[in-house]
């Protein structure tokens, strides 16, 4: 039996460095790195931030959750 809304939701994480620099404005990076993952809505109600590898920056950067 279902207990209501599912606790797990799919979120998109985007590189904060690529977004801040304006990937297309400065032409430093050819794109914006994005990852798709799931989070538990009950355990982490705030926005998710993880350190992931950005292939455009060629280093580990903070990836923050964005709206769909």
Curated annotation (Swiss-Prot):
The keyword Chloroplast is assigned to this record: yes
One Pfam family of this chain: Ribosomal_L33
GO biological process: translation
Gene3D superfamilies: Ribosomal protein L33 (2.20.28.120)
GO cellular component terms, semicolon-separated: chloroplast; ribonucleoprotein complex; ribosome
GO-annotated molecular function: structural constituent of ribosome
Main location: plastid
Sorted UniProt keywords: Chloroplast, Plastid, Ribonucleoprotein, Ribosomal protein
Tree of life domain: Eukaryota
Subcellular location, record wording: Plastid, Chloroplast
Entry similarity comment: Belongs to the bacterial ribosomal protein bL33 family.
Protein name: Large ribosomal subunit protein bL33c
Gene that specifies this protein: rpl33
């Amino acid at each position: 039996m279902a207990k209501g809304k599912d606790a797990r939701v799919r979120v998109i994480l985007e590189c904060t460095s690529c977004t801040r620099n304006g990937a297309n404005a400065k032409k430093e990076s050819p794109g914006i790195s994005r990852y798709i993952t799931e989070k538990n809505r009950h355990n982490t109600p705030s926005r998710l931030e993880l350190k992931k590898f950005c292939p455009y920056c060629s280093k580990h950067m903070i990836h923050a959750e964005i709206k769909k």
